[in-house]
Curated annotation (Swiss-Prot):
Disulfide bonds: none annotated. It catalyses: 2 a quinone + NADH + H(+) = 2 a 1,4-benzosemiquinone + NAD(+); N,N-dimethyl-1,4-phenylenediamine + anthranilate + 2 NAD(+) = 2-(4-dimethylaminophenyl)diazenylbenzoate + 2 NADH + 2 H(+). Binds 1 FMN per subunit. Keywords: Flavoprotein, FMN, NAD, Oxidoreductase. Homodimer. InterPro entries: Flavodoxin_fold, Flavoprotein-like_sf, FMN-dep_NADH:Q_OxRdtase_AzoR1, NADH:quinone_OxRdtase_FMN_depd. It holds the Pfam family Flavodoxin_2. Belongs to the azoreductase type 1 family. Its cofactor is FMN. The keyword Oxidoreductase applies. Its EC number is 1.6.5.-, 1.7.1.17. This is FMN-dependent NADH:quinone oxidoreductase 1.
Amino acid sequence: MTKTLIVNAHPDFRNAAHYSVQLEQAFLQLFQTRFPNDTVDVLNLYDTVIPQATVPELLGIWEKQAQHVNLSIEEQRLFAINQQLLQQFKAHHRIVIAMPLHNFNVPARLKDYIDNILVARETFRYTENGSVGLMTDNYRVMLLQASGSIYTRNDRYTPMEFSRLYLDKMFTEIMGFDRFEIVRAQGLQTNGVAVSQALKQAKMDLKAAFERFYD
């Protein structure tokens, strides 16, 4: 069975009232129905230490390693966490990201997580013709996104929704994933949009995406 990892990027991930959390639960229900004897691993980013790409943390650690300088005890601890996150990510061929849209982009902790898994010689490599993905063995990613506005009307909001483009390109173009899926619960704070109908549509879209995800 292909292993599945859910990465929950909501800061208030324990609150079931949040729409991205509801999408995550809908995904889990579909999974349990389809694969009753299997389990899903869940990583709650806001309940986990995620090293940051700063000089005191990852940037400083990588610089010391390049210069063959011993790491401090705290740096060793952070690097061990980094390696655990990276190996966990690589071990799962199905990645599901549940997140709200924050200021047209990904939540801050999700960006920190990407910095831990987007690693040269691990998930991609450099060549004379540019970077090449190493995650090419039937890896797929699904984004479960909740947003207050609607971003699929080809209006002024559409080009401002950076999260989908960023995640799609990082996973497929840089790391080499075979497929990127997005399921949107959108317009949840937009006048004239019925939240119940938006969620119903999102769950219908999720069901179809789920079938493609595990085909």
